[in-house]
Regions:
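N-terminal Rossmann-like NAD(P)+-binding domain of SDR-like oxidoreductases, especially those catalyzing
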Residues: 1-218
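A conserved pocket-lining segment of Rossmann-fold NAD(P)-dependent short-chain dehydrogenase/reductase
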Residues: 105-106, 172-180, 207, 212-214, ...
Length: 257
């Protein structure tokens, strides 16, 4: 089937795109390469060598399967997003096109505004475009369990909605689980799920919103096929996940705390 992967050049998007192509799907990566630009802004980079996007795609086509690249900023160019969906007619879109680092989202005013503008507007643009073009397109979104916070006060987190009883009316209701985001980034993921709930309720969009834990690691079966397919390995204090930093410290004989 045809699958569009928004943010397919990033840490999660790239190996996902390769996996989908390896399974026989026709994959279109859509990305504005913002993660590479942020590397320059922070004067940091991946521990692994990341090939230019053109080399990445050529290598993926040679070793993996049917995969293409479209440069597009879906936050700033909703018309371009609509044109792409009309042209490609995907069965599913996978949405990774968001600034993903909680520490980055808390650096300062510019980073806070960029994270909110990019993440929430990109999500809304996808939903709005699908309403106009084809409501049968499936949306798969990578959220984060961080929208719930890390307190034990609210108890275990259920799948789907939380069933409650409203005291004043004694009526039962299904609501989104209580949010307690710890950063601007996590807050945007909570706002995303409000957007998704609204579009599902009013237009019946088919949406899978995944709230997973920390994603970590280096390689997959596909990224290991050729040097140009190598995935990111961020180990800095902004984009490096705690697992990656622990791995880097252990490899250098440092004690992990």
């Amino acid at each position: 089937m045809k699958i569009v992967v928004f943010g397919g050049d990033g840490f999660c998007g790239w190996p996902t795109s390769l996996k989908l192509a390896a399974e026989g799907h026709s994959v279109v990566i859509v990305d504005n390469l913002s993660r590479r630009a942020i590397d320059e802004q922070l004067s940091s980079g991946s521990l692994t060598n990341i090939a230019p996007i053109k080399q990445r795609i050529l290598s993926a086509q040679k070793f993996v399967g049917d995969i293409r690249f479209e440069f597009l900023d879906i936050c700033k160019d909703p018309a371009g997003l609509g044109n792409l969906l009309r042209r490609e007619k995907p069965h599913t879109v996978v949405h990774f096109a968001e600034q993903r680092a909680a520490p980055y989202s808390m650096i300062g005013d510019g980073e806070r505004r960029y994270t909110v503008d990019n993440n929430v507007t990109s999500t809304h643009n996808i939903c709005s475009a699908i309403v106009e073009i084809d409501r049968n397109i499936n949306i798969v979104h990578l959220g984060t369990m961080g929208v719930y916070g890390y307190s034990k006060v609210f108890g275990s987190i259920p799948e789907g909605y939380l069933n409650i009883q409203i005291k004043s009316t004694k009526k039962d209701a299904d609501v989104l689980y209580l949010a307690n985001p710890g950063s601007i980034y996590h807050m945007t993921k909570y706002l995303d799920q409000l957007v998704f709930q609204f579009y599902n309720k009013n237009w019946g969009l088919k949406i899978t919103d995944l709230h997973q834990g920390i994603v970590w690691g280096t390689e997959t079966a596909q990224t290991s096929l050729a040097p140009d397919l190598t995935n990111r390995f961020d180990y800095d204090g902004i984009y490096g996940t705690v697992m990656n930093r622990f791995i880097s410290q252990a490899a250098n004989g440092m004690v992990c705390h």
